[in-house]
Amino acid sequence: MGMAHRGRLNVLANIFNKTYKEIFSEFEGNKYEDDTIAGDVKYHLGFTSVQKCDNGKKVKLSLCPNPSHLEAVDPVVEGITRAKMDNVYSGNESSTVPILIHGDAALAGQGVVYEVIQMANLKGFKTGGTVHIVINNQVGFTTNYIDARSSTYCTDVGKVTLSPVFHVNGDDVEAVVHTLEIAIEYRQKFHKDVFILSLIHISEPTRRL
């Protein structure tokens, strides 16, 4: 999985079950066993954990480290996924699923996104489909969405690969879960990219920050 810094601690705590003690100890600047990551901010760091699913099976989750440069992690996630497919799972595309979480402005504005999508179906780079989750808060830092792109939707970049795009109201939790289930089923059956555009809002105090 790859994502930017916003919401990262939430994902680490509630999806990856990284303990609050581990998270808050990083605020204290505690020393790491590996000095290569010393001094990096806590919402740049990666994490790996094994989670038990409702059916009793276990799944290994990995969140890749990511700098403040939005979308820079995208090709890294794809590369890790392809390497695991080739070297660990004997080319089985169903064994591992790359998930990328985007912001609406970064998805439309960062060139690396288009580059990664263009490689999605190439023999030397394909990973059996990526699940793109787009958190659309309708603003890119201080840029209104009207001034952020020429296309109607930020997910129009997915038209390059004729990928399906599911639009869902981010305030409707049940609908979001249902959409995610459909997206995963599509990916596992057709091994193609799929996009989920979750429309949310951002509060005024947060926007000013």
Language-model features: locations:
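Conserved internal helical-beta-strand scaffold that buttresses enzyme catalytic cores
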Residues: M1-V112, I117-V131, N136, G140-I146, ...
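Conserved thiamine diphosphate
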Residues: D54-N55, K60, Y153-T179
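C-terminal catalytic or substrate-handling cores of phosphate/nucleotide-
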Residues: V77, L180-Y186
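Hydrophobic/aromatic ligand-binding patch that stacks against planar heteroaromatic rings
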Residues: L122, V157, Y186
